[in-house]
């Protein structure tokens, strides 16, 4: 079995005996937590500690903590401002402070990887494509300035970062949680605009997440997340992201789950050049997925295993838990949020904010 090429979700706020046994057996690369796992600060820290205790190697402990409506700690702490609200203020120092406080918050809770910043250009700001409020803007330089400042200070707080959603989920006109978006953008279109933030920030990024978007002009058969042309040919070989950890977005989204059966998505992800396949919700399929990955040749997984080992060496352990420190960070977050109010808007009906 190749469980170490999986990143898995957890079902609730504490591990069940069955989950603990499964995770101990599979030894996945790590875990992602959502709002369903977070009911209190001390409880969340215990959960991340328990997951660490199950792992032979330091596990990836990840979360989507972007700010705004994608704030997994919204039930236990004030929400940090969204990327859109921060960039609208035009002050990169505010973006830097948001990154710093995100890092402080996550390390106290036991996380070592944040699936942020979003580097998608906001091509369709009013569209139901799951990204409303989550992008730093339409202009690549604005994204570089603000996402770069945010990312730099997150990493200075010893939390690793993951840019998303490569190559350009901002081109999507629909929500991959519901269906597979299709974009007519060519490789030239992407290089002209969407890829600029990735290449500009390359030395400061730890990981890259692939989008569930189909680009027929580049690969008519596979979405970006499962496309060898995009993952290996474009991201790694052409752009030079050959040292970064690369992983799929959640393979349980309908964009993928409705089209791939019997864990063929997991195999396709690794064969495409991803290092990790992410299963966030249907963890009951994790053991079967690991068995399918075990059928891959060592040649097919060698690069992923090397990059994962290198990535693990960059992970930092959690800060010593302190209720006093937690309350102090929450107070600073509330003060920043008061400086950067969110625009009142009708947000799209996407599950992204509810997990």
Kindly give the residue locations of the regions a language model identified.
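Flexible, glycine/proline-enriched loop segments at strand-loop-helix junctions
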Residues: 87-93, 132-141, 180-189
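Preference for extracellular/luminal or secreted protein segments
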Residues: 1-29, 257-355
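Short, conserved phosphate-binding/catalytic loop or strand-edge motifs used
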Residues: 119-130
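Short, flexible, mixed-charge acidic loops at enzyme active sites
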Residues: 71-80, 125-127, 168
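Catalytic domains of carbohydrate-active enzymes, especially glycoside hydrolases
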Residues: 21-34, 101, 108-113
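A generic, well-ordered mixed alpha/beta core segment in the N-terminal half of proteins
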Residues: 75-110
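Second-shell residues forming the walls of enzyme active-site clefts
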Residues: 9, 36-54, 59, 69-71, ...
């Amino acid at each position: 079995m190749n469980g170490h090429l999986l990143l898995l979700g957890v079902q609730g706020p504490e591990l069940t005996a069955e989950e603990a046994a499964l995770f101990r057996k599979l030894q996945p690369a790590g875990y992602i937590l959502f709002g369903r796992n977070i009911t209190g600060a001390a409880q969340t820290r215990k959960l991340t500690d328990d997951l660490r205790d199950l792992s032979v190697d330091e596990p990836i402990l990840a979360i989507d903590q972007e700010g705004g409506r994608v704030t997994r700690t919204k039930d236990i702490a004030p929400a940090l401002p969204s990327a859109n609200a921060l960039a609208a203020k035009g002050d990169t120092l505010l973006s830097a402070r948001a990154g710093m406080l995100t890092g402080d918050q996550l390390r106290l809770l036991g996380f070592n990887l944040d699936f942020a910043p979003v580097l998608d250009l906001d091509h369709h700001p009013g569209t139901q494509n799951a990204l409303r409020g989550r992008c730093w803007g339409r202009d690549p330089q604005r994204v570089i300035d603000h996402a770069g400042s945010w990312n730099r200070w997150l990493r200075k707080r010893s939390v690793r970062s993951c840019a998303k959603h490569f190559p350009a989920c901002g081109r999507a006109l629909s929500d991959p949680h519901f269906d597979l978006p299709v974009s007519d953008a060519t490789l030239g279109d992407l290089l002209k605009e969407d890829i600029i933030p990735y290449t500009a920030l390359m030395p400061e990024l730890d990981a890259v997440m692939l989008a569930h978007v189909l680009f027929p002009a580049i690969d008519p058969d596979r979405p970006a997340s499962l496309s060898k042309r995009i993952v290996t040919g474009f991201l790694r070989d052409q752009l030079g992201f050959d040292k970064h950890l690369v992983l799929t977005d959640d393979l349980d989204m309908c964009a993928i789950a409705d089209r791939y059966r019997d864990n063929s998505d997991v195999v396709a992800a690794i064969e495409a050049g991803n290092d990790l396949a992410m299963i966030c919700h249907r963890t009951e399929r994790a053991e079967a997925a690991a068995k399918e990955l075990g059928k891959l040749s060592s040649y097919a997984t060698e690069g992923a295993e090397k990059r994962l080992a290198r990535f693990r060496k960059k992970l930092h352990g959690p800060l010593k838990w302190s209720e006093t420190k937690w309350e102090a960070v929450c107070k600073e977050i509330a003060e920043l949020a008061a400086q950067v109010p969110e625009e009142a808007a009708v947000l799209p009906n996407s599950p992204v904010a509810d997990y």
